[in-house]
Amino acid sequence: MQAIILARQDAATGLLPASTAITVHGDYTHAWVRDNVYSIFAAWALALAYRREDPPLAVPLQASVVRLMRGLLTAMMKQSHKVERFKHTQDPLDALHAKYSTQSGDPVVGDSDWGHLQIDATAIFLLAL
């Protein structure tokens, strides 16, 4: 648990990187929305299981889930202006970004440089709130 989940979570933003690899194909240390949303549910489910079987182990996982949800929400709130535009245009260029810097929560690619329209991941995240 510590080595796989908690050690990889950024201390400042709470976001998890997609990987720790930087290869010729790209920098995978960024936080993808979909990966972080699924990580939220995985850590939450694990925390629920530990809460019943071994309560002291549940505490750091619960804190990890809160940090991760706050980090993702903060990254999305930095782009609130895009949400308003997207409501009117429904243009993928106005969609929330799909990947963020793990260290700052800021977008790491431009609006037209990546397929940002990931409404499914954003919707699941909002339901979890």
Q: What residue ranges belong to the model's regions?
A:
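Acidic, mature catalytic/reactive cores of soluble proteins
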Residues: 1-129
